[in-house]
């Protein structure tokens, strides 16, 4: 039941994010929903699931949810805002952030908007994002189109 509520919440949050403000029209294969999950931690079994939704209207949502070694959702965060693509760089303009816990979302009133730049590449139904792009701490995540 929690899993169903989680996915219903993700869908509603994405729709609200995309209809709340207008971004730039994006005509790219990146438009759609992409998922990535970390491997379970060896000591605790905890794992994290990331869901990016990129809309054709230039708006995105990123849902980051932790799982306690099971499919059960523990808690997480959601970011929304416009995005833009310039060559192989995608910039997320994070202008709203919320916390997801026990099936409910609470958006922060005092969230300082920030931008995140990532290098990306598309191969078939795989999206590779390089997070912390341009730093020595950079890492890659490979998302699958849903």
Regions found by a protein language model. Give the residues of each.
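Positively charged n-region of N-terminal signal peptides that target proteins for export
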Residues: 1-4
